[in-house]
């Protein structure tokens, strides 16, 4: 009886832990009521944070990443964290859902993405080339046009941009009812100004697309996390949170564009702020 009781307690504890880290993919998991209203009205809500805040650009003291079964990880170990909340008006049916799915896996469609350059004070080219690959090679593969939605698919793509050079990402796309979760994990170390700042799998970008029929579209929450293992690089101000916040905003605006929505006037996430070097 005693052994049975202990076993029962352990099972209950395990269940409680699992429930805690596996929050539902609901709008309220990622958005407060005020945030929901703001994004439906057209706002895009960014946050950015970097350890030591050497350039005094952190917009918040910390960023709490909502935890789900798709991102059960301790994000406090990351030295750079940025996130963004936005809303995509979208009429959902079987055909449009598949279209959205294929847009998310259109790696070649990322070529030409622009970001707001503080140095230039205007939009500049971010992604010079992007395409699907099979491995860590330059062998270009065509995008796959899916004719049905799978619970999970995985691909790899190469991305060359004018800030971080050539990167390789593992892309995972999950389908959960009418919702999607996309995870891009950089599978090579990142170099910044000749310094290798982290190891492989230490730069990640998550995107959650939660459909709300009443609102008529997707509530979207994206975040990126980056390890920077050299304190000297962080303390020197070489790593700016705006650099990564602007990258995240670039991907948001480009996704809108791929869906036929012009948000180019939202390319600068920090209008009137952080414009000086």
Regions found by a protein language model. Name each.
Residues 4-15:
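Sec-dependent N-terminal signal peptides
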Residues 163, 168-207:
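Hydrophobic-ligand binding "helix-grip"
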Residues 20-149, 194-195, 213-277:
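Terminal "cap-and-tail" regions of soluble proteins that handle hydrophobic small molecules
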Residues 131-180:
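Long, positively charged binding patches that form subdomain-scale interaction surfaces
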Residues 15-16, 205:
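Generic detector of short, well-ordered, non-transmembrane alpha-helical segments enriched
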